[in-house]
From Swiss-Prot:
Classification of source organism: Eukaryota, Metazoa, Chordata, Craniata, Vertebrata
Assembly behavior: Homo/heterodimer, or complexes of higher-order. The structure of beta-crystallin oligomers seems to be stabilized through interactions between the N-terminal arms.
UniProt modified residues of type N-acetylthreonine: T2
Alphabetized Gene3D superfamilies for the sequence: Crystallins
InterPro entries per the UniProt record, alphabetical: Beta/Gamma-Crystallin, Beta/gamma_crystallin, G_crystallin-like
Gene Ontology BP annotations: camera-type eye development; lens development in camera-type eye; visual perception
Protein's recorded name: Beta-crystallin A4
Comment field on protein domains: Has a two-domain beta-structure, folded into four very similar Greek key motifs.
Function according to Swiss-Prot or TrEMBL: Crystallins are the dominant structural components of the vertebrate eye lens.
Pfam families to which the protein is assigned, alphabetical: Crystall
Residues spanning the signal sequence: none
Gene from which this protein is expressed: Cryba4
Annotated Beta/gamma crystallin 'Greek key' domain residues: 12-51, 52-98, 105-146, 147-195
Domain of life of the source: Eukaryota
Keywords annotated in UniProt: Acetylation, Eye lens protein, Repeat
Length: 196
């Protein structure tokens, strides 16, 4: 069973700038933004998350690489993408992560796509799935019972990030194609809960 999250208006705030170091033009968001281009920005190069958790995307329309943005300052691309294998130096669209709940998050991982094969139940952060006993470097599918999670391609939360939420796809992610437009492999080796 997937638990539905409660969305509250005004719970999210992020301020973005078009230059690194919190310089240049700025804009504040309290809701999703499919394209900063519509606001006259070419890109976002620094930001401050004031409340809530957000996911930033490399391209407009919530496409491309995903970056989890939790409360704090991001003075440049290396602050949000320094752990990834292929960092994007800009962000072009944003949306809040509605179901982030660090204390009550549950995720089931499956060995194969379509919820087949061996499975594991998670309710904590795992910097290495192999260290917790998961065989191999791949996860075929996910079912998010509650909360929001970020899965990473490599141990230590490095590599491509995939945001999984209980209120998207009814919490069911049957194949890597549902993890995001940039997903091209089943390789997932670390998983953590997203914090509000």
């Amino acid at each position: 069973m997937t638990l539905q999250c409660t969305k509250s208006a005004g719970h999210w705030r992020v301020v973005v700038w078009d230059e690194e170091g919190f310089q240049g033009r700025r804009h504040e968001f309290t809701a999703e933004c499919p394209s900063v281009l519509d606001l006259g920005f070419e890109t976002v190069r620094s930001l401050k998350v004031l409340s809530g958790a957000w996911v930033g995307f490399e391209h407009a329309g919530f496409q491309g690489q995903q970056y989890v943005l939790e409360r704090g300052d991001y003075p440049g691309w290396d602050a949000w993408g320094g752990n990834t294998a292929y960092p994007a130096e800009r962000l072009t669209s944003f949306r809040p992560v509605a179901c982030a709940n660090h204390r009550d998050s549950r995720l089931t991982i499956f060995e194969q796509e379509n919820f087949l094969g061996r499975k594991g139940e998670l309710s904590d952060d795992y910097p290495s799935l192999q260290a917790m006993g998961w065989d191999g470097t791949e996860v075929g599918s996910f079912h998010v019972q509650s909360g929001a999670w970020v899965c990473s391609q490599f141990p230590g939360y490095r590599g491509f990030q995939y945001v999984l939420e209980s209120d998207h796809h009814s919490g069911d992610y049957k194949h890597f194609r549902e993890w995001g437009s940039h997903a091209h492999t089943f390789q997932v080796q670390s998983v953590r809960r997203i914090q509000q």
